[in-house]
Amino acid sequence: MTPETIVNLQKHPIEDLNYTKHCKAKLDLNGALVMENFLTDESLDYLQYESRELRNLAYFCHQDHNVYLLEPDPDLPDEHIRNLAQTSDKGCVTHDQIPVNSPLRTLYEWPRFRGFLEAVLANSIFPYT
């Protein structure tokens, strides 16, 4: 798969400057950016299959924390977001375990996608080694 067949560029023209500005404005306003149907159906189906195949290589982690990943603050009310615990369960597969021809690796290494993320986040992005 090529980057152009992985990303739904009809709905998410990440190389369009106006679209990028719109995404940044939504992120700045809401604190989150939801990009529904960002991946094409074909690439999403394949990535789900691939993740099931790689599951045995994943490192799994369970954590209880607040949204800030900080210790609770006794000076704030109990119902303050800083003092509300949530649970995270995740499984991570290291970069070197992801097949070279994986759509995930293709997207991760695509310079135009990285440029879009850097513009929206207003920050540099560096790949893991």
Show where each model-derived region lies:
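N-terminal auxiliary "cap/dimerization" subdomain that precedes the catalytic jelly-roll/cupin core
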Residues: M1-H80
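Signature of the catalytic double-stranded beta-helix
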Residues: L39, Y46-A58, L76-T129
